[in-house]
Amino acid sequence: MILPIIAYGDPVLKKKAKDIDKDYPKLEELINNMWDTMYNAYGVGLAAPQVGLPVRMFMIDPAPFADDEELDEAEKKVLMDLRKVFINPQIIEETGEEWAFSEGCLSIPEVREDVFRQPDITIEYHDENWEKHTETYSGLAARVIQHEYDHIEGILFTDKLSSLKKRLIKSKLANISKGKINVEYKMRFPNAKKAR
């Protein structure tokens, strides 16, 4: 089932999410619904807060980035094979010199800005079968994980922008929160005027 994606301005996107356990109600159904929702919106990642749930879970499938001609074959292969669910993740290390990449977000449609992040991460997490993993990622794979991880920390990519950039997109963000935007996927807007 396709769920509505929560738009910029909803408080759930600014809350630090809570861990879940194996008994979380209808977890398998939620995971399947989130995959459907992400693919329906042509996303490469989706975090539980983006569907209104302040829990520490996200999923990624960065395969569309593998079409980038500038990437080497090894990085393309990583991106093609990286369809994963991350439950209760913790980034335990971020290293390397920060680099910029134009990021977007399903909760903030039609806004893309350069965000600086470190290129290498080590992350601990449980998969959907509750197997524990500790893995290291680099480049675009790391960036997609960092972006989704920020969601469960209550951080949006717009929070990482300079004050000037924030001022330049302020009215665009206000319009998104009010639902004054056309999107091809289902969304829930926190400040939309209710019809009488």
From Swiss-Prot:
PANTHER family: PEPTIDE DEFORMYLASE (PTHR10458:SF22). CDD domains: Pep_deformylase (cd00487). The keyword Metal-binding applies. Its EC number is 3.5.1.88. Binds 1 Fe(2+) ion. GO terms for biological process: co-translational protein modification; translation. It is an enzyme of class 3 (hydrolase). Removes the formyl group from the N-terminal Met of newly synthesized proteins. Requires at least a dipeptide for an efficient rate of reaction. N-terminal L-methionine is a prerequisite for activity but the enzyme has broad specificity at other positions. The keyword Hydrolase applies. This is Peptide deformylase. NCBIfam families: pept_deformyl, PRK00150.1-3. Belongs to the polypeptide deformylase family. The active site is at E148. It comes from the Bacteria. GO terms for molecular function: metal ion binding; peptide deformylase activity. Fe cation binds at C105, H147, H151.
